[in-house]
């Protein structure tokens, strides 16, 4: 297990910190000094800290300390490795680099690894399978992209995604999704009812005749994409953000901007239970 604060022994060298778990093995698991040295060097090579073996934790950077903690966990050759928010003490640039390192180590060792984090970007980028929890209750499991595209409830939809999902008060009427007075998408297979409509930032398309009209507040240039910051009276998240290609910048009007929506990026939820609303199968097949 690797803790958030690494829990290294400050008076021991890196080599002795890594070796410490092996010195406490009992019975048949006990190793000779030669076997311990070999195991320690293998773990150090795995996390690329061979040149730091004679240093003490106080002489190391945060990223180096984190790698020592991982080596100490790996040296026992565990069947399961638990990483409990191991990157939370690192700055943004080092977090990104160390995230890649952890992924490399996991692939090299093929040890089943449980990575605990409150950072959804870390969870999405590092995992093969993701488990979303709320107050100790499992909400959903699956591959990161699957959970992002098809969340089971509003909590999961809000947790995953940067910028976060935009949330609108809406209603289903006569087989269409209404936001305010505008019918923005077909909604066959759902009965007439109030809904919460979640729209991913990448789910907007600039369109002169688009059904969703918003007040333009700001445009943020992001290089390949632009973030359009808008307002809408029925939007419950502030600000409303739409991510579109930078090629669309020349199409932006002033004052009011109109959008068409990508149906696969619009998610409907029950306003009270916040569970996902899905059309009847027979209605989906008819479309």
Question: Can you name each region flagged by the protein language model?
Answer:
Residues 176-287:
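Non-catalytic connector elements of ABC transporters
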Residues 54, 161-166, 191, 222-224:
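Short flexible coil/turn linkers enriched for glycine and charged/polar residues
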Residues 4-155:
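ABC ATPase nucleotide-binding domains
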Residues 149-172, 198:
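C-terminal boundary and immediately downstream tail of ABC-type ATPase nucleotide-binding domains
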Residues 97, 150, 158-159, 207, ...:
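Residues that scaffold the ATP/ADP-binding catalytic core of kinase and kinase-like folds
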């Amino acid at each position: 297990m690797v803790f958030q604060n690494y829990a290294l022994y400050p008076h021991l060298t890196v080599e002795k910190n890594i070796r410490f778990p092996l010195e406490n093995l009992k019975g048949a698991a006990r190793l000779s000094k030669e076997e311990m040295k070999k195991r320690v060097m293998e773990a150090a090579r795995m996390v690329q800290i061979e040149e730091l073996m004679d240093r003490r934790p106080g002489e190391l950077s945060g990223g180096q300390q984190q790698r020592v903690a991982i080596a100490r966990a790996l040296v026992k050759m565990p069947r399961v490795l638990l990483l409990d928010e191991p990157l939370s003490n690192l700055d943004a640039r080092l977090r990104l680099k160390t995230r890649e390192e952890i992924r490399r180590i996991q692939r090299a060792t093929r040890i089943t690894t449980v990575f605990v984090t409150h950072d959804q970007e870390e969870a999405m980028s590092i995992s093969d399978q993701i488990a979303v929890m709320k107050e100790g209750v499992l909400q959903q499991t699956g591959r990161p992209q699957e959970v992002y595209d098809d969340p089971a409830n509003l909590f999961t939809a809000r947790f995953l995604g940067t910028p976060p999902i935009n949330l609108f008060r809406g209603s289903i009427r006569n087989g269409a999704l209404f936001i305010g007075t505008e019918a923005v998408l077909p909604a066959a297979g759902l009965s007439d009812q109030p809904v919460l409509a979640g729209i991913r930032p990448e789910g907007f398309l600039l369109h002169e005749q688009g059904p969703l009209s918003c007040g333009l507040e700001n445009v943020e240039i992001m290089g390949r994409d632009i973030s359009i910051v808008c307002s809408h009276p029925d939007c419950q998240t502030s600000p409303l953000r739409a991510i579109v290609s930078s090629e669309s910048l020349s199409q932006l009007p002033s004052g009011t901007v109109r959008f068409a929506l990508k149906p696969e990026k619009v998610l409907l939820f029950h306003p009270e239970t916040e569970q996902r609303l899905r059309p009847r199968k027979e209605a989906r097949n008819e479309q």
